[in-house]
């Protein structure tokens, strides 16, 4: 393996790219094995591992691509450049964290930060990552290179001015962009477009340019109404910037996983590209996280190498192709290597790789795109026109993903059902069969069918208090709840309400929620045991209403073309005792059948079995509930006649304090 600066690549002035105009493109690459010294202190496995950049470099070499690029040596960032976006205290902390004087404190410091590990190689790697992006950006802005890819780690887009978080120590892209704008005015870079296609919102980058009209920040990410990392409202489409920077911050927040090429390209074609054309940047930075790639263990999305190559190719229309890619996330080694190769081939202006069969965006994707356009159109006239009905009705229904317990027979049945559902043909009102879920108008036929079936919805959390539950049925908001619920399509109240006790463990976890703010929310272990007892309030509602409650609980829209939980799924959990995971990786994605009451299935929704293990290990935090949330549970237990106030408080305290 050749190292950065060795003879594997061309030197400045040499080139072997395709012809662009009257000359050939010079594509820069930076890679340094030294950045692999940043690792977990105890050698434990971690998704942000050194092999992430090794496999990319090896892939580029094996494909003969790195040999056709200009390979630059890495460079350490200067403190004065880091302090363009970071506080002096933060820079000093990262600088000193790998010294022997900090050996005994390093783990304690990391434990106080959000999703950070530190070791003796962390400081040098962080300085090299930021400095290398600065160096590459300077070469591109000077015209010595046309574009380039900095294969660096640790990543940067989560790092804020005074805080390391989300695997990020310095905000590499923000440092480099600020360097060009503030330290090299002679280069004539006055407007910078930063595109962040990492599956997680670039919260750090957004905050650093929040009031700066020189930087247009565009982030497309899983958001799920603030439930996906980094949790909160920062990634919402209403966050558009402030003061002179108002309108220069654009978020495209997916409300579910499974988004793929069609969804991302729709966001490009109907938001990013028209705005970029108006903005007319001088340089483009790309926070190139590949964790939205297919098979990524953290992202849950389905972007292919072809999808990344097309997105990048569309951006090369602007800034005379002056694009600087900086690696962010991406945790499937095969996906990150293939996606990186596809992007470098585009930079060299090679022919794009063959793409997958044509597909349509999810119907939820069009809703997000329309909401973003409506919010931003006052700043960007190109977004003012409404999208055509014909366009937005080229869509795919929200996906349904089935999982099961470890029982192989049940797992086969679940997969078989998924296969059958994927082959369904849907008849539209005109009688035309639409294959592969390419439906036209939103169908309501499933609602009529599911409205005929009753189920018991068993609540163990805030929905035990009936006024709170009715928000999911009739819409509205109760005291302490920070969001307004849209309600169900059928707003009929529950036909009956009863209380039961079930042998499942109640616990509270997660850092915060959109509905209740900072503090844990209630979950039950999907598996029963002989020790624990959980009080649940059972509401008799229709299966149609249950779908709408399930959708709202998991941040999905209720006006879906297809049910999240249909009659086949009900039969599956009823007969086989399976667990159905509907919205992938959602907090309450598991539907569990607890038995029957008067021959009517009792259904509850909770976390997955794998999530329980993550709660136990500490990967997902156990947290006591917020006061308003706990009070809602207590009111439900008391007003429902289940417990006295003192008993209810003791019940909640026990669930909080008892180890999982």
From Swiss-Prot:
Disruption outcome: Delayed flowering under both long-day (LD) and short-day (SD) conditions.
Positions marked as site (Polarizes the scissile carbonyl of the substrate): 331
InterPro entries in UniProt: HDAC_PDAC, His_deacetylse, His_deacetylse_dom, His_deacetylse_dom_sf, Ureohydrolase_dom_sf
Swiss-Prot/TrEMBL GO biological process terms: flower development; negative regulation of gene expression, epigenetic; regulation of timing of transition from vegetative to reproductive phase
Keywords, comma-separated and alphabetical: Acetylation, Chromatin regulator, Cytoplasm, Flowering, Hydrolase, Metal-binding, Nucleus, Repressor, Transcription, Transcription regulation, Zinc
Listed cofactors: Zn(2+)
Enzyme Commission code(s) on record: 3.5.1.98
Binding site for Zn(2+): 198, 200, 291
A GO-annotated cellular component: nucleus
Class of enzymatic activity (EC top level): hydrolase
MF annotations from Gene Ontology: histone deacetylase activity; histone deacetylase activity, hydrolytic mechanism; zinc ion binding
Any Pfam family: Hist_deacetyl
Localization in the cell: Nucleus; Cytoplasm
Function statement: Responsible for the deacetylation of lysine residues on the N-terminal part of the core histones (H2A, H2B, H3 and H4). Histone deacetylation gives a tag for epigenetic repression and plays an important role in transcriptional regulation, cell cycle progression and developmental events. Histone deacetylases act via the formation of large multiprotein complexes. Involved in the regulation of flowering time by repressing FLC and AGL27/MAF1 expression. Forms a histone deacetylase complex with HDA6, FLD and MSI4/FVE that represses FLC gene expression to control flowering time.
Assembly and binders: Interacts with HDA6.
Family assignment from sequence similarity: Belongs to the histone deacetylase family. HD type 2 subfamily.
Record protein name field: Histone deacetylase 5
Naturally occurring in which organism (per UniProt): Arabidopsis thaliana
Gene behind the chain: HDA5
């Amino acid at each position: 393996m050749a190292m950065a600066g060795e003879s594997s690549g061309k030197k400045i002035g040499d080139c072997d790219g395709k012809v662009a105009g009257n000359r050939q493109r010079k594509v820069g690459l930076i890679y340094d094995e030294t950045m692999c010294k940043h690792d977990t202190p105890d050698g434990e496995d971690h998704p942000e591992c050194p092999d992430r950049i090794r496999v990319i470099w090896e892939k580029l070499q094996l494909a003969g691509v790195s040999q056709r690029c200009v390979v630059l040596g890495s460079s350490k960032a200067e403190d004065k450049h880091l302090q363009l976006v970071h506080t002096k205290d933060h820079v000093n902390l990262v600088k000193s964290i790998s010294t022997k004087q900090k050996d005994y404190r390093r783990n304690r410091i990391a434990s106080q930060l959000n999703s950070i590990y530190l070791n003796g190689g962390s400081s040098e790697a962080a300085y090299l990552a930021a400095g290398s992006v600065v160096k590459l950006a300077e070469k591109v802005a000077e015209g010595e290179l046309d574009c380039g890819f900095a294969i660096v780690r640790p990543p940067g887009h989560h790092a804020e001015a005074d805080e390391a978080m989300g695997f990020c120590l310095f905000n590499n892209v923000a440092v480099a962009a600020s360097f060009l704008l503030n330290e090299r005015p002679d280069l004539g870079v006055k407007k910078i477009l930063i595109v962040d296609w990492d599956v997680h919102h670039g919260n750090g980058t957004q905050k650093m340019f929040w009031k700066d009209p020189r930087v247009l920040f565009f982030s497309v990410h899983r958001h799920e109404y603030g439930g996906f990392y980094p949790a909160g409202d920062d990634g919402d489409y209403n966050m558009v910037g402030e003061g002179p920077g108002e309108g220069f911050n654009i978020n495209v927040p997916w409300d579910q996983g499974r988004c793929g090429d069609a969804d991302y390209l729709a966001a490009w074609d109907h938001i990013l590209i028209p705005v970029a054309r108006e903005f007319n940047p001088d340089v483009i930075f790309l926070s190139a996280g590949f964790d939205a790639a297919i098979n990524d263990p953290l992202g849950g999305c389905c972007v292919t190498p072809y999808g990344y190559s097309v997105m990048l190719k569309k951006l090369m229309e602007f800034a005379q192709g002056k694009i600087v890619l900086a690696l962010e996330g991406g945790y499937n080694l095969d996906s990150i290597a293939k996606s990186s190769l596809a992007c470098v081939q585009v930079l060299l202006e090679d022919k794009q790789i063959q793409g997958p069969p044509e597909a349509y965006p999810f119907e939820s994707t069009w809703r997000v795109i329309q909401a973003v356009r409506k919010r931003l159109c006052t700043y960007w006239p190109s977004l003012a026109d409404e999208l055509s009905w014909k366009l937005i009705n080229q869509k795919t229904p929200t996906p349904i993903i089935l999982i099961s317990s470890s029982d192989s027979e049940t797992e086969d049945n679940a997969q078989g059902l998924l296969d059958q559902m994927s082959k369904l043909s849907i008849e539209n009102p005109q009688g035309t069969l639409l294959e592969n879920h390419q439906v036209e108008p939103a169908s309501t036929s499933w609602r009529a069918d599911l409205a005929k079936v009753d189920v018991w919805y068993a609540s163990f959390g805030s929905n035990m208090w009936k006024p709170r539950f009715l928000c999911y049925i009739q819409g509205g908001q109760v005291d302490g709840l920070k969001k307004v619920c849209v309600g169900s399509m059928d707003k009929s109240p529950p036909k009956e309400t009863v209380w039961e006790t079930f042998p499942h463990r109640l616990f509270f976890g997660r850092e915060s929620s959109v509905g209740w703010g900072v503090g844990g929310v209630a979950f039950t272990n999907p598996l029963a045991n002989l020790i624990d007892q959980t009080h649940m309030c059972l509401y008799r509602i229709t299966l149609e209403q249950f779908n709408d409650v399930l959708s709202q609980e998991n941040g999905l829209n209720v006006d879906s073309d297809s049910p999240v939980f249909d009659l086949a799924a009900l039969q599956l959990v009823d007969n086989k005792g399976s667990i159905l995971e509907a919205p992938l990786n959602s907090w309450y994605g598991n539907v569990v059948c607890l038995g029957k009451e008067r021959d009517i299935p009792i259904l509850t929704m909770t976390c997955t079995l794998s999530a329980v293990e993550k709660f136990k290990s500490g990967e997902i935090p156990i947290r006591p509930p917020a006061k308003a949330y706990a009070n809602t549970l207590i009111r439900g237990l008391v007003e429902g006649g289940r417990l006295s106030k003192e008993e209810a408080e003791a019940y909640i305290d026990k669930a909080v304090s008892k180890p999982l």
